[in-house]
UniProtKB/Swiss-Prot annotation:
Domain notes: The presence of a 'disulfide through disulfide knot' structurally defines this protein as a knottin.
Keywords tagged on the record: Disulfide bond, Ion channel impairing toxin, Knottin, Secreted, Signal, Toxin
Stretches for region Disordered: 60-83
Recorded superkingdom: Eukaryota
MF terms (GO), sorted A to Z: sodium channel inhibitor activity; toxin activity
Residue ranges the record assigns to the propeptide: 22-74
Function description: Probable ion channel inhibitor.
Protein name, as recorded: U11-theraphotoxin-Hhn1t
Tissue: Expressed by the venom gland.
Biological source species: Cyriopagopus hainanus
InterPro entries associated with the record: Toxin_22
Disulfide-bond pairs as recorded: C75-C90, C82-C95, C89-C110
The keyword Signal belongs to this UniProt entry's keyword annotation: yes
């Protein structure tokens, strides 16, 4: 009976010590895989960033081409404050100093001609 106990104890000690070694190896392998995964993620992130920058450049180029070919579409309506130096009143309107209600605001408004 003692030999069975000694054999069992010996097998148990070997299993525990080898298990610890395997655990350390597994931990090191996981650490290496994590580091490799991080480098892969960094590479993928940089690639995605480059693609996004290219797309943004294309969109900005298209937008600038559009703005060169288009005229100003928005204008200021009647009775809306305007700047006397840069009037953006709609066609048929003129930027004038008001006669009554705008006097206290000291501003110009778009009025019909």
């Amino acid at each position: 009976m003692n030999t069975v106990r000694v054999t069992f104890l010996l097998v148990f000690v070997l299993a525990v010590s080898l298990g610890q070694a395997d655990k350390d190896e597994n931990r090191m392998e996981m650490q290496e895989k994590t580091e490799q995964g991080k480098s892969y993620l960094d590479f993928a992130e940089n690639l995605l960033l480059q693609k996004l920058e290219e797309l943004e450049a294309k969109l900005l180029e298209e937008d600038s081409e559009e703005s060169r070919n288009s005229r100003q579409k928005r204008c200021i309506g009647e009775g809306v404050p305007c700047d006397e130096n840069d009037p953006r009143c709609c066609s048929g309107l003129v930027c004038l100093k008001p006669t009554l209600h705008g006097i206290r605001y000291k501003s110009y408004y778009c009025y019909k001609k």
